[in-house]
UniProtKB/Swiss-Prot annotation:
It is found in: Membrane. Keywords: Membrane, Transmembrane, Transmembrane helix. It is a single-pass membrane protein. This is Uncharacterized transmembrane protein DDB_G0290911. The chain crosses the membrane at residues 20-42. It comes from the Eukaryota. One of its GO terms (cellular component) is membrane.
Amino acid sequence: MHQSQPQQQIEEYKQIKKLLFLVGLTIGKMATSRILSFLGFINCEIKLK
């Protein structure tokens, strides 16, 4: 009677997938803001020269 095993694995997989998505989203946002501030810094440097 191992009927519930695959379902449990699917649920765990969904949770892990959601967690990875959130982590990826957070890293993406951080990287984007870093890149934007870096580009802004370069832009200011170019304008000052």
